[in-house]
């Protein structure tokens, strides 16, 4: 099992860029997901989870592997590293790196009278997480994140 304890690690610095810079997310084709429920929803939604970083004092390796399958790289991180990467104040001790995907509206299969949430260019990645949790709780059929610059 790989371990990273320094927030100065080049890999961790690249993840901070993913967290903070839309350009880094576009260039790498990846983004960060924070939280067990969010990782499960992304996995269920067909997102490819590449790596999971977790605090071993909060989660066991077995718990982490149950979230996104066994074909994922798992990295134990220190609390210092987690605090550097975490967006939310409340902590679950887990962050995933996932592949981005772009979907066309033509491929969206909706039933009759669908309930859709449309968000135009959310400023912070954490806002998207809140929108997704709200949409899930409200039983929405789709969430569309629109970027007027693309």
Q: Which stretches of residues belong to each language-model region?
A:
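Boundary-proximal intrinsically disordered activation/regulatory segments immediately upstream
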Residues: 1-62, 149-150
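Structural motif
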Residues: 30, 50-52, 73-75, 92-96, ...
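Residue-level signal for inorganic ion chemistry
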Residues: 35, 96, 135
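A glycine-rich helix N-cap at a beta->alpha junction
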Residues: 69-87
């Amino acid at each position: 099992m790989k371990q990273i304890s320094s927030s100065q690690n080049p890999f961790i610095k690249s993840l901070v860029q993913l967290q903070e810079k839309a350009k880094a997310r576009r260039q790498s084709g990846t983004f960060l997901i924070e939280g067990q429920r969010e990782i499960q929803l992304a996995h269920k939604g067909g997102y490819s989870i590449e790596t999971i970083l977790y605090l071993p004092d909060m989660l066991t390796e077995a718990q982490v592997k149950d979230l996104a399958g066994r074909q994922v790289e798992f990295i134990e991180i220190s609390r210092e590293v987690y605090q550097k990467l975490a967006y939310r104040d409340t902590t679950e001790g887990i962050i995933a790196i996932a592949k981005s995907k772009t979907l066309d509206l033509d491929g969206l299969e909706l039933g009759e009278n669908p309930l859709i949430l449309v968000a135009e260019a959310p400023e912070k990645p954490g806002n998207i997480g809140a929108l997704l949790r709200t949409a899930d709780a409200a039983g929405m059929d789709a969430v569309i994140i629109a970027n007027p610059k693309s």
